[in-house]
């Protein structure tokens, strides 16, 4: 997926909600889009699926597998581009778990044998078989969002887009859900584009990160490159990065920036050892 200097302006609005957006997503990668609330993250994601695109005037092109997105029919987009929304209840359309898993495939006209096979695969992969016959009203928020994800993956999409999918979930359910997203990318090779406010659970595992501000993508690169750039610019988004990166940024260390807690612990041990080694002894201080 790629966009070529894309702009979007809402009706009766003088300012652009997206401005000079130019980015490229490599197939099979996990990509995180981050930025302050209202910077245009959700709007950008909705432009990656035509039926969700907001009204207004736009210029530029969005390409999917080398083709203009607006020229790709809705059926192909429905099957190949999966989209998980913020609120789990806004996406569920049936009353039973098993029916929700099969609904997308039924709508696309798959035969019963294929539907049964894919539903069984997804129920097993996501651990849904334990509540397969339950009504959706009996599910927790985390289970509902997992069901949405499984129903989308049953259609075997090439691109999975997630718009702050854990915003309605408790911390444990959110962590479990993001682990599943990482597993999908790692095991199946599905390209993932996600916006998420719990950056510590997803940024360290991303292949590429993008930072938005006022409708523009002003930084892109690996998580370490993004962290270093935000630190150098003293940008407010640095305080939303994973805690190990924040601690590293508060020091004068030139070592490799840690991303995970494990890396942070190892870096902190090296940093503290270096401080102890270079600090003057009490006798040296008294002489001075």
Task: Outline where the language-model segments fall.
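Conserved small/polar residues in nucleotide/adenosyl-binding loops
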Residues: 1-9, 277-282
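Conserved ABC transporter NBD signature motif
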Residues: 57-68, 77
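Conserved ABC ATPase "signature" region
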Residues: 113-131
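Conserved ABC ATPase signature
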Residues: 135-139
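Catalytic Walker B motif of ABC-type/P-loop ATPase nucleotide-binding domains
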Residues: 160-163
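H-loop/switch region of ABC-family ATPase nucleotide-binding domains
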Residues: 196-197
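Conserved beta-strand-loop-alpha-helix hinge in the C-terminal portion
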Residues: 212, 216-255
